[in-house]
Amino acid sequence: MRDNTSPISVILVSSGSRGNKLLFRYPFQRSQEHPASQTSKPRSRYAASNTGDHADEQDGDSRFSDVILATILATKSEMCGQKFELKIDNVRFVGHPTLLQHALGQISKTDPSPKREAPTMILFNVVFALRANADPSVINCLHNLSRRIATVLQHEERRCQYLTREAKLILALQDEVSAMADGNEGPQSPFHHILPKCKLARDLKEAYDSLCTSGVVRLHINSWLEVSFCLPHKIHYAASSLIPPEAIERSLKAIRPYHALLLLSDEKSLLGELPIDCSPALVRVIKTTSAVKNLQQLAQDADLALLQVFQLAAHLVYWGKAIIIYPLCENNVYMLSPNASVCLYSPLAEQFSHQFPSHDLPSVLAKFSLPVSLSEFRNPLAPAVQETQLIQMVVWMLQRRLLIQLHTYVCLMASPSEEEPRPREDDVPFTARVGGRSLSTPNALSFGSPTSSDDMTLTSPSMDNSSAELLPSGDSPLNQRMTENLLASLSEHERAAILSVPAAQNPEDLRMFARLLHYFRGRHHLEEIMYNENTRRSQLLMLFDKFRSVLVVTTHEDPVIAVFQALLP
């Protein structure tokens, strides 16, 4: 299967007083060393075709000569400054033609030539050749890269005529190779000679190689201006399907203050990859972030605005340097990812044994074959270092997408056929069904994160309108009307089922249930309700347990962070 996210080639064309020129293309066009040998022998009409050996060549742009590409890719001036897209058979060309608006005052005064002439180049186009069936998001991303490179080249051309100098060098080398080919056996590709002598050609080659491998492009055009680009399709992908950038962007927009940022590499190596002129705020976020610290705490510790932390976190996630998780705490439930490698002698198993000498990866992963909360691994008599190592192992497995986290969702389920709900005293308590511990026992990890406590309370903007403390206390007429209004959106049989629950006789419980009713549609997990309503976990679990006859509990991934948990590095 071909990789439709990688470009077939990169091409640089120009148009000017000397006509349309193909300055550089990479990979180089494959020349047929013995064209006569293919036509000297007559072929039978029943002979098997040998074109399969050159399928990649035929699918690419190598069948187009330099002259043809220069003609079709060097557009008119009217098309400059906008997206260029051309499909020919199974090849799609994407670029951003750019006009060079030269003025006499912009010609370099340091030119030693006695007669300086105006530059002959009118426009240029950096084009990426793709397969015709490439995803539209890939096409848009490569157009964005072409536009960035064109903008930098246009700036350097105005500043020091960089593009004109490189073009003159390339054309001179092409003429030299063409003259050499006249005395040899056949034509030679000039790009072999251009590559080691032209900085711009090497930059385009580096961009192509990076797009085909890591997807991260870092260029310094003219050893001066930086072009940074990320092809998210190369960084974010699942085991068997392509994750479009739109899905990543939707998840990033859904980040909440109770989420956490998990770096995918150690702090030292990540800081070493940052450019010299990077934002100091980004450095502070990297140094302050922790897997047990939510974004709200991260903003406080880094002394940054929460919105700025969101933006920096989204930047790190988009570039594949971090993922979004829920902060580690005892109540978190994890299970083995369906995409995890469980081979005994896999490279990951070797890395795990090197990182944690007293443990082996298959045995640890076996403990997560079924959903399990971290509280089940706690041993009150064990030293604190053992608990710290447990957190480190979970973080290590989350970084490599070996584990996925499951959240608790609650759905209102009242059957129309039931005239009255049947209380089930022999049922397993709700707290046991969701993996919770005693409601009066605080569940905090030794890392000391407030988010890992059973009594986690966070301040939320929505809390002002929905917090129970703001409602009048007691069974007042106002409270009764508010409860009736909240229950008015339900059907008749749903209201009857709820009111027939014994706990509904308690006005406080009924009012709290009615206030949380819009969360009982299976779209908000337990931790989100805790944050939005500024409510403790124990309060919610007790309420769910009292109304368990009309509630159905499910556990699955949070759609916001599920896209990050499914990604493979």
Swiss-Prot record:
GO terms for cellular component: GATOR1 complex; lysosomal membrane. Coiled coil: none annotated. GO terms for molecular function: GTPase activator activity. InterPro entries: HTH_NPRL3, Npr3. It comes from the Eukaryota. Changing residue 92 to Q: In FFEVF3; uncertain significance. Residues 34-52, 438-468 have a biased composition (Polar residues). The keyword ATP-binding does not apply. The modification Phosphoserine is found at residue 476. Pfam families: HTH_NPRL3, NPR3. Residues 27-60, 416-477 are annotated as: Disordered. GO terms for biological process: aorta morphogenesis; cardiac muscle tissue development; cellular response to amino acid starvation; negative regulation of TORC1 signaling; positive regulation of autophagy; roof of mouth development; ventricular septum development. Keywords: Disease variant, Epilepsy, GTPase activation, Lysosome, Membrane, Phosphoprotein. The keyword Membrane applies. It is found in: Lysosome membrane. As a component of the GATOR1 complex functions as an inhibitor of the amino acid-sensing branch of the mTORC1 pathway. In response to amino acid depletion, the GATOR1 complex has GTPase activating protein (GAP) activity and strongly increases GTP hydrolysis by RagA/RRAGA (or RagB/RRAGB) within heterodimeric Rag complexes, thereby turning them into their inactive GDP-bound form, releasing mTORC1 from lysosomal surface and inhibiting mTORC1 signaling. Within the GATOR complex, component of the GATOR1 subcomplex, made of DEPDC5, NPRL2 and NPRL3. GATOR1 mediates the strong interaction of the GATOR complex with small GTPases Rag (RagA/RRAGA, RagB/RRAGB, RagC/RRAGC and/or RagD/RRAGD) heterodimers. GATOR1 interacts with GPR155/LYCHOS; interaction takes place in presence of cholesterol and prevents interaction between GATOR1 and KICSTOR. Belongs to the NPR3 family. It is linked to Inactivating mutations and truncating deletions in the genes encoding GATOR1 proteins are detected in glioblastoma and ovarian tumors and are associated with loss of heterozygosity events. Inactivation of GATOR1 proteins promotes constitutive localization of mTORC1 to the lysosomal membrane and blocks mTORC1 inactivation following amino acid withdrawal. Epilepsy, familial focal, with variable foci 3: An autosomal dominant form of epilepsy characterized by focal seizures arising from different cortical regions, including the temporal, frontal, parietal, and occipital lobes. Seizure types commonly include temporal lobe epilepsy, frontal lobe epilepsy, and nocturnal frontal lobe epilepsy. Some patients may have intellectual disability or autism spectrum disorders. Seizure onset usually occurs in the first or second decades, although later onset has been reported, and there is phenotypic variability within families. PANTHER family: CGTHBA PROTEIN -14 GENE PROTEIN, GATOR COMPLEX PROTEIN NPRL3. This is GATOR1 complex protein NPRL3. The gene is NPRL3.
